[in-house]
Structures are given as structure tokens and as C-alpha cells.
């Protein structure tokens, strides 16, 4: 895959991970993404939470077949916040998202009281299962499709057991639950508020 930057600071890749990039935009900005489907099956990009036309929003009826391409073009009409994008093809959304085809879509705004830069941290939480060769395992049986399943490893930003050194400062955490079924209850390890 290739990411072609439209302007400085628009795309933040997550280093050493299988996840998609973090896209940073501003309200009113025009977005243009050329999606060339090189997957074994059809796919489509759903821009989760964005106010855009149905044709651009990645509905399964607009799935892009293998080898085909489509250009998503829209103007950001959302208020500043944290959104995400992921595939949404009929009946195979789960396996494609599980494989890492997802990323954050951040609409930036002027909030002088909120931390920015290194103090504005994305946290994409996922649970996954791996086989003996450290390859992702997606239980694709009927019960897993109906009820979902819980992985045995927690990943943060696509990496296991990661830690990030921090300064004694106020941080803004942009948390995305990218798991297929798991619900998280987050708390500080020392029990503080």
C-alpha cells in the first residue's frame, strides 16, 4: 500500500504495525482517497461517523471488486473529534478489520484547553489470537460469526505489550475500540481518577 500525502501533517503512519495510518483533517477540508482493491475478495471503505453522501460512505452495496478501484471524494462536514475508517463488505467486514484494514480519522479543531502534539495520543485497542508461527488466527466458524470471539492477546496501536514513556503532564487519549467483540473497561493501574 502507498499513502500519498496531500499536505504536510495530514497522514501519521503508526510505525511497526499492520494498522492503517491516522488521517488528520480539518472541518471543511476536501478529502480524496483512491482505493485500489488488491484483496482476494471485494471490499469498501466505510468512514465511520462522518457526514458524507451514501455513495462515498462505504455501504456494502458499493463494494469494490478485486482488481477494481474507486475514488472517495468528500468534504469534511463533521465537528472536531475522533472517527475511524474500516472496510464494510457484506459478511466479511470482521475478517478484514481483524487483519488490520482500519485506522483513525481525526478531525482537528481549535480547542486551546486540550493537549496537542506529543500529548495528543491515539490508542487503538484490539484483541487478537496468534498461532504458533505468530500469525493472526481468525476463527471463521458459524458461532464466531454469530457471537463474535475474544482474542487472547491485547494489542495497542497494533503492537503487543507496548509501553510508552510519558512526561508528568496532561495528555489527551483518543481511544478506539478496534476489537471485533470485546468491550473494554479502562482504568488507571493505581486506582486514581
Positions of predicted regions on the chain:
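Histidine-centered copper-binding motifs that mark active-site loops
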Residues: 1-193
